[in-house]
Amino acid sequence: MQIEEHEIDVNKIINVAKAAGDKILEIYNKESFDHQLKIDNSPLTEADIAAHNLIQQRLEEITPTIPILSEESSFISWQERKQWKCYWLIDPLDGTKEFIKKNGEFTVNIALIYQNDPIIGVVHAPVLNETWVGEQGKPAKKITQFDTKIIKVKPHNRGEVYKVVGSRSHAGDSLNEFLKELEKYELVSMGSSIKLCLVAEGKAHLYPRLGPTSEWDTAAAHAIVNAAGGKVIDNETQMPLQYNTKDSLRNPHFIVQPN
């Protein structure tokens, strides 16, 4: 993909995500690993730091002039960020709680944001050895150890049971209120950005997120949902989520659904 003076080879980004996943698995497969709590009480492990360092180094080698915003470098000021037209937005380890629980439902997320929209997204699930890829103007795809397939969202048909994906770690009253509006539904619990990817590949119709998330939690999978024919919309304005438009890096509540 050509972005102004930058030629982006998505295969290189896939390789970066997989390399970060391998680094995470080295720590995941140890008998024990260190973790601590950040200021917001979210967990931080040595795997988060190792993956962050690897991704930052590799992206700086591939695109030395494109800035990088990571969950682990979120202290970068709005005064600096608002000058960015194009930047990498990464979550080195999304689903740290799932990582600590050792249920395998965590991901590496790398997105390229251009003019506030996610135009490239790679989500890699190291334990599952599955990778989802979205690139603006091209079909979304899912890569496994067996094959690579084009993926598409699945529209809901009248009378059909809604398949709704929800957070394994953050389900709450807001989700229950949302579900009351649906006549028939089946709830699928999942961790990390895999939830958005399930909508992208047609395994779920909806993912309502009516609780706090940050921009690095959604950007990569958002690009994949877009490429698969879906959308990620603000629950209040019904407009697509945008990135780096304000001082706060918090997302509004949102819904992931087919177009």
What is each residue range found by the language model?
Residues 110-197, 245-259:
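Acidic beta-strand-loop-alpha-helix segment within the catalytic core
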Residues 1-93, 114, 173, 177-180, ...:
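N-terminal subdomain of lithium-sensitive/metallo-dependent phosphomonoesterases centered on the IMPase/IPPase/PAP
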